[in-house]
Amino acid sequence: IESMPFMEAARLLGREEGRDNVMFIHTTLVPIVGSVGEQKTKPTQHSVKELQGLGIRPDVIVGRSDKKLDEDIASKIAFFADIPREAVISAPDARTIYEVPLIFLEQKVPELIEKRLGLKAKKPNVKKWRNFVDRITNGGDEVEIAIIGKYTSLKDSYISHEETLLYAGAVLGCKVKIRWIEAPDLEDSGSTDALEGVDGVIVPGGFGSRGSEGKIMAAKWARTNQVPYLGVCFGFQLATVEFCRNVLGLKDANSSELAPEGKNSVIDILPEQEGVKDMGATMRLGDHKVKLSKGKARDLYGKAEVYERHRHRYEINPDYIDKIEKAGMKYTGRDNGGRRMEVLELEGHPYYVASQFHPEFKSRPDKPSPLHLGLVKAALANKKG
């Protein structure tokens, strides 16, 4: 019942725009039943009949199954749906979701769409995409990166980091294994044993006090053990807090978000956020220019100015910057005005880099985030000793 308005809208779209301008592609389940592994078409026959009864005639049927559709099964679906055999597309399980476009390309799905809608024929160049798929499915050395979060049981909570590490591994010809670690567990146990053996650490963005001390523990562990570290947003801020506590000796250093009455708020609220009570859509959001000075981040980006996406309400307290930099933590990235700190790097460490912005948001399969790429590259070197 809930889907009926959408079905009617689809039917009306075909009527109002003209059938030459609308194409219906129906994805249906083709289950495998019994010990002999026989594919069954009954669910597809039923759903096609239902659609036809609603005034929608599928032009293409995509049969989702564990394996490639048997030829007789595909022909049977075409017969009952009254469509050409080539319009029945097999969608078997793939090694990776990124292989799916290649599977459809082999079955000439683009040609079906071009022919049905009268579009100009194009021949896509998928050489780079094939190479990418080959790399992520046939990677070489394996590195293990720990992601320290507090929602790690929810698969998609840190999906941008997960995918970016996959892309970085593809570029470097390695596989990246992720070790998910709950920050509150580190905090409660008071131990960093869960980190032992990893080749790199990511502390991603977040908010709130729960798990913050666990993330600080992870930042300290990576710093003192010379393990590659990437902090993002909250991970950038907490890396600063950890450094101030354990290197500068400011034992009560903290963020004013976590300790509003604290004496040493090395992380403080943005000036424009002071007094804001309605928190909805008031953060510093979106693309902002970042100016990079000499350092790892600039080398990885290959340029002195970049635009990256932001989502934060707090920043490094400018009153502490000189002390922090004199102690060896350099802010090699700043905003366009030079006042806000955007990137930090630790001197004498193989890779201890953090950013106030979210580099994972702009990462793409053929162009992974430079900071994640640097982390994986450093992790490979760390693993090989």
Regions found by a protein language model. Name each.
Residues I1-G348, Q356-G385:
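N-terminal beta1-alpha1 cap of cysteine-dependent amidohydrolase-like domains
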